[in-house]
Curated annotation (Swiss-Prot):
Name of the protein described by the UniProt record: Uracil phosphoribosyltransferase
Lineage of the species this protein comes from: Bacteria, Bacillati, Bacillota, Clostridia, Eubacteriales
UniProt organism field: Clostridium tetani (strain Massachusetts / E88)
Function comment: Catalyzes the conversion of uracil and 5-phospho-alpha-D-ribose 1-diphosphate (PRPP) to UMP and diphosphate.
Gene designation: upp
Lineage top rank: taxon: Bacteria
One Pfam family matching this protein: UPRTase
Catalytic activity: UMP + diphosphate = 5-phospho-alpha-D-ribose 1-diphosphate + uracil
Cofactor descriptive note: Binds 1 Mg(2+) ion per subunit. The magnesium is bound as Mg-PRPP.
EC number of this enzyme: 2.4.2.9
Molecular-function GO term, any one: uracil phosphoribosyltransferase activity
EC category name: transferase
Length: 209
């Protein structure tokens, strides 16, 4: 069964408040989303495997630990998920980056795929899917299904804010995928937006309407 982890660190909550504020401009919004993604990465990677190695410090030889598990691929759901990639890459610079393009049909609210480019060894990697908002859950569930179709086995989803409805959709569709969020918000409104949410993350990241 999938696990939902809410990462309620004071720095994350402070920055999330600034992200939510409608008066925060695109430049600050981009920087804040990147910073929160980087902070969340500490918890997202908490269960990564380690191995012991021998090194030599300026003082003596000693044993220490390094990452030993699978290599990582970050897969943003376009376009808003792009805003979280650089923050995670700062901590895992060797990670590969795939892209999945989905947009939401404004009438049906269902996701439509328009782009998919993934590392060839996607099945051997730990996959971190990024999307600032988990609203209806349709895009995330479809993106994860597409990853599995391409061979991915080890997937975790990272979002800034999530609606309970979206969490349930992803958990029901993919009980093997853990979800990490900075905030679980109240609900979805009639238009499928998260309340209180942060508006349209893609538009706010890139200054579009």
């Amino acid at each position: 069964m999938s696990k939902v982890t809410q990462i309620a660190h004071p720095l994350i909550l402070h920055k999330l408040t600034l992200i939510r504020d409608k008066n925060t401009g695109a430049k600050d919004f981009r920087e804040l989303v990147e910073e929160v993604a980087m902070l969340m990465a500490y918890e997202v990677t908490r269960d990564f495997n380690l191995k012991e190695v021998e090194i030599e410090t300026p003082i003596c030889k000693t044993k220490s630990k390094v990452l030993a598990g699978k290599k990582v691929a970050i897969v943003p759901i376009l376009r808003a998920g792009l805003g979280m990639v650089d923050g995670i890459l700062k901590l895992i610079p060797a990670a590969k980056v795939g892209h999945i393009g989905l947009y939401r049909d404004e009438k049906t609210l269902t996701p439509v795929e328009y782009f998919c480019k993934l590392p060839q060894d996607i099945g051997e990697r730990e996959i971190i899917v990024t999307d600032p908002m988990l609203a209806t859950g349709g895009s995330a569930a479809d993106a994860i299904a597409l990853l599995k179709k391409r061979g991915a086995k080890y997937i975790r989803l990272v979002c800034l804010v999530a609606a309970p409805e979206g969490i349930k959709v992803v958990m029901d569709a993919h009980p093997d995928v853990d979800i990490y969020v900075a905030s679980i918000d109240e609900k979805l409104d009639e238009s499928g937006y998260i309340v209180p949410g942060l508006g349209d993350a893609g538009d706010r990241l890139f200054g579009t309407k």
